[in-house]
């Protein structure tokens, strides 16, 4: 079994999925993963479908130099956003795989949440491109590893009655006790 960067608090209530050496842009995939981190599974899948249809965009926060601006980024408080289709498809496949793993464990798919998603750089794949005057330049791709953990959310527990309790110090408790004794006598 491979080691994940994060461990879930309750392994019986979580399912994981991972992809290694995936031939998809590391930077785009990292931004896509950050966009859905902590979301419910159904919401994340719906959002990624909307990104593919260009109805919503992925906000680019870290790797955003030379990226055009779009109004669809306002939803996330950014101006720079894109629609990285290849990254979205890879993450959608992993979410589907994680959901299948969760259902095989007997977990409820409607309660699943993306509790951990991480994108790491894989070794670059090297090629070469031929330039003018007999020069040769590197032509590298930046693949990545993706891992995610889906966790079944616990039922919400109602808050206890928040009535104000009177807190007394030792001297006040002693005075109160003597007053009770006096009134009882």
From Swiss-Prot:
An example GO biological process term is: cytoplasmic translation
User: By its UniProt entry, which InterPro entries does this protein fall under?
Assistant: Ribosomal_uL22 (IPR001063), Ribosomal_uL22_CS (IPR018260), Ribosomal_uL22_euk/arc (IPR005721), Ribosomal_uL22_sf (IPR036394)
Keyword check for Ubl conjugation: no
Report TM segments. Answer: none
What superkingdom does the record give?
A: Eukaryota
Q: Which GO terms describe its molecular function?
A: structural constituent of ribosome
Q: Name one GO cellular component term.
A: cytosolic large ribosomal subunit
UniProt keywords (A-Z) are: Ribonucleoprotein, Ribosomal protein
Q: Which family does it belong to?
A: Belongs to the universal ribosomal protein uL22 family.
What name does this protein carry?
Large ribosomal subunit protein uL22
